[in-house]
């Protein structure tokens, strides 16, 4: 049976490296599923979860919180390069909750000051924190 080699890399190093049956990720255009023998492709990723069904289990799925980046598929290798990414088991939930609260506070401040740049940054920070919290629930 064919399989995929999946690796997730950030500036801090390798976050994930395993063999998989399927990888599902959210691109900026929508969700994409990658199976073995997929055509070569490079796509930008949205801030979202990546689901990886491993070859060593019919039921186990690995979840990775990815904060944007790109995904390249070539020769049954799926490479995800992201500014930051965390496996569900590595997420510090209290820290993610604090980041969520901080982002919500910054959004309110930005709205009060009509600061569009701060609002945009705080909204992205909120999305990242919520993504990490959601992915941690799969662990």
From Swiss-Prot:
SUPFAM superfamilies: Epsilon subunit of F1F0-ATP synthase C-terminal domain (SSF46604), Epsilon subunit of F1F0-ATP synthase N-terminal domain (SSF51344). GO terms for cellular component: plasma membrane; proton-transporting ATP synthase complex. Keywords: ATP synthesis, Cell membrane, CF(1), Hydrogen ion transport, Ion transport, Membrane, Transport. InterPro entries: ATP_F1_dsu/esu_C_sf, ATP_synth_F1_dsu/esu, ATP_synth_F1_dsu/esu_N, ATP_synth_F1_esu_C, ATPsynth_dsu/esu_N. The keyword Transport applies. Pfam families: ATP-synt_DE, ATP-synt_DE_N. Signal peptide: none annotated. The keyword Hydrolase does not apply. It is a peripheral membrane protein. Transmembrane segments: none annotated. GO terms for molecular function: ATP binding; proton-transporting ATP synthase activity, rotational mechanism. HAMAP family: ATP_synth_epsil_bac. Belongs to the ATPase epsilon chain family. F-type ATPases have 2 components, CF(1) - the catalytic core - and CF(0) - the membrane proton channel. CF(1) has five subunits: alpha(3), beta(3), gamma(1), delta(1), epsilon(1). CF(0) has three main subunits: a, b and c. This is ATP synthase epsilon chain. It comes from Enterococcus faecalis (strain ATCC 700802 / V583). The lineage of its organism: Bacteria, Bacillati, Bacillota, Bacilli, Lactobacillales.
């Amino acid at each position: 049976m064919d399989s995929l080699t999946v690796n997730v890399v950030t500036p801090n190093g390798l976050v994930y490296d395993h063999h998989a049956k399927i990888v599902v990720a959210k691109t900026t255009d929508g969700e994409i599923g990658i199976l073995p023998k997929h055509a070569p492709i490079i796509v930008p990723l949205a801030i979202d979860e990546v689901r990886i069904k491993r070859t060593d289990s019919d039921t186990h799925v690995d979840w990775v919180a990815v904060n944007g980046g790109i995904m390249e598929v070539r020769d049954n290798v799926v490479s995800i390069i992201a500014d930051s990414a965390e496996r569900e088991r590595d997420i510090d939930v209290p820290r993610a909750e604090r980041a969520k609260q901080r982002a919500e506070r910054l959004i309110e401040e930005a709205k009060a000051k009509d600061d569009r740049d701060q609002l945009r940054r705080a909204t992205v920070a909120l999305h990242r924190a919520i993504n990490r919290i959601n992915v941690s629930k799969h662990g």
